[in-house]
Structures are given as C-alpha cells and as structure tokens.
Amino acid sequence: MDFSIKGCDWSKGEAKGFLTGKSDCIVLGIFEAQTLSGAALDIDTATKGLISRVVKAGDMDGKRGKTLFLHEVSGIGASRVLLVGLGKQDAFNQKAYNDAVTAAWRALLATKVVQVTFSLAQLPVDERSSDWGVRAAILALRNETYRFTQMKSKPEPASHTLKRVVFSVDPADEKAAKVAVKQAVALANGMDLTRDLGNLPGNVCTPTYLGNTAKKIAKDWGLKAEVLGLKQIQALKMGSFLSVARASVEPPQFIVLHYQGAAAKAAPVVLVGKGITFDTGGISLKPGEGMDEMKYDMCGAGSVLGTIRAVAEMGLKINVVAIVPTCENMPGGNATKPGDIVTSMKGLTIEVLNTDAEGRLILCDALTYAERFKPAAVIDVATLTGACVIALGGHNSGLFSTNDALAGELLDASREANDPAWRMPLDDEYQDQLKSNFADLANIGGRPAGAVTAACFLSRFTESYPWAHLDIAGTAWKGGAAKGATGRPVPLLAQFLIDRAGQ
C-alpha cells in the first residue's frame, strides 16, 4: 500500500488540489453539534452546502464512530465523500481519534475504493501535530488489514481494494509527516512479524524456528546474530534457564541480535524477551481448557524481534541488543519438580516451588547475560503472570521498574504510541514473599501480589543497570472469537527507542 503526504491549510484556501484531484473518496470528520470547520467546511463550500444539509437533516449527527457515504458529489474531484463522526469536540482526545480513524478504515475497506484522500490527520488531538495523526492512522489501517492465513490450505486473498492513501497535513508538519509514514510502515511491519510469530502453532514456532527467524532478520537488515545452542548455554552455566528446557525434545536456543545505529562505544539499550514457545506448566501442569493459547507464551520474544526489525527499518541512530532465551516448558521423566533447587548464571540458588512460574527462570539468566553489554538500560518483556491480567485486564501492560527516570520515559512512550502501560509497585516489602528456607530465593511468593513478586524476583538479577519489566500477559493476545496476537508492545518499545535516538 502506498502512502503520500500533501501539505494543506484549509483555512487559507489552499485546498484546490484536493478539491479537483481525482480520488475514489475523500474522508471528512464531523463533530457532534458543532459548526463545520477545516476540510469539512471547504468541501461544504465546494459542494454548495451539501455537507451542511446532510448534517441539518440528521443523517450525520457527528456521534463518535458513525460513518456515512455520499455518492456522486458534484463540485469536487472525488467520486465519494465519507463523513466520520468525531463525537463532542471538547472530548476529542487520542482515543476518540483512534475510534474515528478505525471507523473510517472499516467503512472504506468494505467498499471497492482504490485511492483515498484522508483529512482526519489534521484534527486537533491533545496538542498533537498532524504527523502524529498520520502515523496513528497508518497503524490503525494496518491493524484492520492484518490477516493470519499462513496455515490454511488455501490462503485467503485480501478482501479490500485500497491501494493508495493521500494524507493532507498542516504545511508546517509536511516534512515530519513524511518521516512519520516511514516510521509507521516500519512499526506495522514489526508488529506483523510479532503477530505472525505469536499466531503460529507451537509445532511450527519452536525455539529453532525463532532462532532461524532471528538469523533472517539479521540477514535482511544487516544485523549481527548469535544463536547459542545447548552446549553453549551449559558452558555459560545458565542452570535456571536449563531447568525449564530440560524435559522438552526441542533443544533450547539463546538468541542475541545486535543492531548498531550509533557509535560502537555508545552503550546499547538491551531488550530481553521471554520465549517459551509452548507452556504446559511442566510438572505443575496447567488445566487442559485454554491450554492451546499457551503458544502465545513467546510473545515477549516476538515483540523484541519485531521491535529490533522495526528499528533497523527506521534506521534509528541508537545501539540495540535483543536477547531471547527460548525453550518449551514440558512435563517428562527428567522434568524439574516442585521443590527442586537450581543455580542461576548469577550464582543465586532458586527453589522451584511451582514449575509453571518458569518465565522468570529463563529471564533471570538472560538478565545476567545482559550485564556484559554495559547497557544504558535493559527492558524485559514477558507474558509473565496471570496476576497481571487480574490486576489490569487487557488494556494496560504492567510496567515495573527500579528506575523512576526510565519508568517515566516508558510511560511517555506508551501515551505517544497509543500502547497503554500502567506503573505497578515494586516496594522492598514484597521481596519478603520470595524467602526460601532452603535456597537464596523461591520462584514464587504466593497468591498475593503475584505480578509484583514476579517482578521482584527479576529485580534480584538487575542491580548493575537501569531496568524495567513489562508484563504483557493481558495485552499480547486476545482470546475467544477474536483470538490472535496483538503485536503489542512493539509500538511502546519502538517509540521509547525513537525518543532515545532523538528522532
């Protein structure tokens, strides 16, 4: 799909090209109970009051998400006009904008339009510039057009005909909007990779498959890839990671991807993604109902791979390292048992009270490994706890950090990227729940504050650098009839890196 940018100040009569240019449809926003303004006012004038008459008749009341097509409109070059309700102007925020653009894309994708002129990016949204609106609109469109059909015997062809979108933006934002197009396409491509990896079944997306995916990313985008096998992992003394992997016939992999966009001496940001390609719970076996969704337990790994791919496509001036410990968590005659004690790469001993709390066991060794890069920051991403889903549901990812400045950056990025996160507590008092009579610490701390104690466990391995943890158990995928990976938190992570790179 092709996206292009044209500067236009509708209030200064600069819209002639939009009014006369050939297009299958021009998209206009209508506020509830407000006089027309901007693009809608100009089109109304060119069509001799058609938009005003439609609004006055009540066919378009401006309620948020409502859409109405006008056909064979005279006075303009477009063959259709799509009116989109924006809701009340004083309540028009980022969510309202996203609702409006999503409604517009859904209406357009149900038609046979090929080329569209899109004016909604110029709407005033929480003091955001129109380049922000362009990026959000492209991501919303790519979200609507994403389909996972790779595993079907006859992959379904695209059901829409849309090929080209021309965005009108404020002239002062034209240059930035062109950058926003590049960023949005790269982000969408990274999210699609993340979704594809999550949606693949566990018998296809194995640890070896993830390793091969990392190698392909490296080859396609000029990155350096290291994929360590069992013997190399053993040599690193990653006893905690290996305690999870030991009962599976699928060999574990330890993936390291290096992106160098800045000077070699510049400290990298390290992203660590949990890569459990299928989680049965091990000896602490999960219930059978819904276990198929445990193929999504590698979505942390998928999001890290999708993010570094997006960073490479954007060409950000920053160094990034992606680390993915990946294996299956299976029962078996040689599986780790509740009560077993294992030794982590850091040397701390861990009493494994529950083998279904395995994500933290593979992440802790990866977090220790990250020390060798002397990182500017480390962010781990994991579908870690059901407790986080209970606490936050499916809207906000859980954010934990021992560094207020880093947490603030990530929260700012989450708002900018429309990828919500909520900071959770990490007080020292919660650490007491991880005490063990027999080892340095236990891998669970009981039912109370389960997401917090999981983050507390990880914090024991992150003392030498600024660190944050994203628990995406509620946001990485949707269940039920809408089952599928979401691609989150690629937008949040990518925006954080864009901000760090000053781009």
Curated annotation (Swiss-Prot):
Mn(2+) 1 binds at residues 279, 356, 358. It holds the Pfam family Peptidase_M17. It is found in: Cytoplasm. Its cofactor is Mn(2+). Binds 2 manganese ions per subunit. Keywords: Aminopeptidase, Cytoplasm, Hydrolase, Manganese, Metal-binding, Protease. The active site is at residues 286, 360. It catalyses: Release of an N-terminal amino acid, Xaa-|-Yaa-, in which Xaa is preferably Leu, but may be other amino acids including Pro although not Arg or Lys, and Yaa may be Pro. Amino acid amides and methyl esters are also readily hydrolyzed, but rates on arylamides are exceedingly low; Release of an N-terminal amino acid, preferentially leucine, but not glutamic or aspartic acids. CDD domains: Peptidase_M17 (cd00433). Mn(2+) 2 binds at residues 274, 279, 297, 358. Belongs to the peptidase M17 family. This is Probable cytosol aminopeptidase. It comes from Burkholderia cenocepacia (strain ATCC BAA-245 / DSM 16553 / LMG 16656 / NCTC 13227 / J2315 / CF5610). The gene is pepA.
